[in-house]
Amino acid sequence: MGIMLFFAAIVLLSLFWRGIEMLTDWWWFQEVGYENVFWITFLTQMKVAALFGLAFFVIFYGNVFLANRLSSRGYWVDKDELIHTPPWELGNQSLSAIILLASVLFSLFVALRGSAHWEDYLQFFNATPFQISDPLFSRDIGFYVFQIPFLKTLYRWAMIILAISAVASGLLYFLRRSFQFIPPKELRVAPAARTHLSILIACLFFVGAGGAWLELNEILFAKRGVVFGPGYTEVTTQLWVLKVLIVVTGLCGLSFLVFIFRRDWRVPAAAFAAFLIVSVVGTGIYPALIQKLQVVPNEIVLEKPFLERNIKYTRIAYGLKDVEDREFPAEENLTQADLRRNDLTIKNIRLWDHAPLLTTYGQLQEIRTYYKFVDVDNDRYTVNGEFRQVMLSARELSYPAHPARTWVNEHLNYTHGYGAVLGPVNRITREGLPEFFIKDIPPVSTIDIKITRPEIYFGEISNDYTFVRTKRPEFNYPVGEKNVYSQYEGKGGVPLSFFRKVVYALRFGSLTILLSDDITPGSRVMYYRKISERVSRIAPFIRLDSDAYLVISPEGRLLWFLDGYTTTDRFPYSEPFRNMGNYMRNSVKAVVDAYDGTVELYLSDPTDPIIQTFAKIFPGTFKALEQMPAGLLRHIRYPPGFLSIQAKMLATYHMEDPQVFYNKEDLWSIPRKSGTGGEREMEPYYTIMKLPDEKKEEFVLLLPFTPSKKDNMSAWLAARCDAPHYGKVVVYRFPKQKLVYGPRQIDARIDQEAEISKQLSLWNQRGSQAIRGNLLAIPIEKSILYVQPLYLAAEKGQLPELKRVIVVFFPGHGRKPGACPPAGVWRRADPRKGSAESGWRSGSGAGSNGAADGRRSLGPLPQGPGIPKTGQLDRLRRRAEETGRHPEKPGKETLTTFTTEGTEMKNFGKIQKPNCQIGDTIFCLYFYRFILPASVFSVPSVVRKPL
């Protein structure tokens, strides 16, 4: 009895703490405006808990109580006679009390465990059809996604409850001596015990027959064959075996009911033997033999129709069916006109990688030890009227980095991060450091984008509770040796009262909350401040992307954008991807205000049946994407994580012919890149470019493909991010008969360039580390341009500087073997004429006064380290002037891509050098050093002609 009371105390204490958590969660849901989510979830959990708890109590207590009553009618004793005196000294009244208490405690435990299935319950009763039928049973896929999971849950719990009830009843009968074994093989069972236990065992088999029917449906998710889903063996062998198993299992149940009236063990024994044979041989050994002896030797012939199904349903499940397929000629004849038409693309080539830029941001702009830049995000803004790709990062508060970690500092004083930095992807200072459009504390902006509300109370690492509007002013930001303080003015946080202070002191396990005089009835408490946790609390059924990104709203507020996915592993025939299931949609865009924590959820894919189901379950929770303010709608982007998964599936499932698919004749892979951490797969990258046959530039997410176990490129994938084409994915295939260099091959060619290798070795020997940036393949018109930045960082310092940019391209056919591409010189911008560009001087007007193109002629170039000597410059100038006297010839143009914008930049000594010859195409590589007497440079286009 004492043990039972001990367990009862534990259960009550658990319920108390659970009640505290539920109460504070209710207050939080009220504050964020999603109280309906709380109540629907809570009431459903109570409903499901009651369903499972009552079911367990009724079945378990009813059977054990019945066993206790029936066992008192007769007992076997050693003299082989049935008597009516209980062998236990414990009275029936005490035993009944113990049974009742145990039943209640176990029922509470089952109820708590069962409440976890609330999502399955709601999906079962709110299922949305997919309007797609599986090819085997012709049922809508929604049946397998929404209804089978709850049926399986009911089956498992029914088996558990019946099994526990049967064991408990049998144990009670055994202790009451309702069984007697008479050597050598006779077992006597009291009539009441035999009847009761036979009914329980029969119920177990009847429920087991239902489980066999569920297993019949699970055949759609078989993993035996060459692909996921039922193959030849499952359809022709295992399918009918499972049907037989359903019948045999039901007959087993009937045999135990017959045993009640006919006291012959042979009937249930024979039925059970048949059950074991079908279960072991029919579902295991026999299909394995068919697979090994019949299918494997004739796999492609027998599995072909099932390969077709796997291809079809996998493409549907990952959205590959909607990927547009286009040809990309991969020509090698970029012209001046091509560059002019794609000037915006050239200006937005990203020169800063996330890792070195994050390190540099930390050194230059963290300001204090307790600030931290967690991540760098890519986005696009209209900057002073120009469409630009930028990189930005939030300056968050890092509690672990604070030198004085007291309770007051962590929960009252230091409550928020402050501001963000924003800069172009392609500009640096004269020291090789990133240029900032927005920087410092408080934020200083040099462009028409301003931050008016820089405080960050909710972020990627804000994972602890904090109190605002207290008597103690909050630290806002430092100014020199002094600090500026403030009070929170927003609507975020849960309002407090004395009662709530007591509850939160219990919730957070801190007596200081209750004793602090700084926390008043007008104070507010903020928790669930980490944005991913905040959104997950509101929509736990959404799988969130790990890469949230920051957006500056037109009003100057800082907002977090977070992509949400609906996934399932219940899509028939679809190939699973790691732990993501086998169906995936980017259905939700979450927007979280960094100041007041407001959460808005928008439907980015309203056609998805899974999100439609949850929209029915939680009405009013989601908004249409069209309801997002226009200023924010311009910043939604295709998530890189989703495109990576689609790309990895497309690498195999672009092959729709089952014969080609089976042989993996055209298998693709994601290119691998080299870096400081070794080789790893390339990740998708954003750029601003004009897609082939499109009229204007747009923000695009790119990822190249290579053939499996090869390094040349076979295709590239583009996901469009701007309206009205948001969400459209296009794969551009290269001609199979043409060799197009892949990133790894370009890396190898760069490694073989003597000038670069020499410079890298020199840097690495001087106490510095040369860091190779990510190599980007940028499609321009019908050609590919490769760009790789080089950074230099001191071994003991953490301030990477951009020192070189490597540009690789293929300059067209018709060049003589071994011919070197021509040299050229940079044009200097003329600030007196308001020129914002510098460029390569070539073509008509070169060497003149510039009247032909309205630009100044070349003047003397400054000397310095890495600058060609005067004689070399004279020869370069004469060759450039000679170029202007010859007409352009097709296939004779080459290009470089970097100039200055309002500043000077000079080429590095030996300007270019051909590395190899492939057929009649020269592989050209350019290695640049920047001489920056002014402040910054950027990346517009430059064209150079051969001499």
Where in this protein do the model-derived segments appear?
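N-terminal membrane topogenic signal
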Residues: 1-6
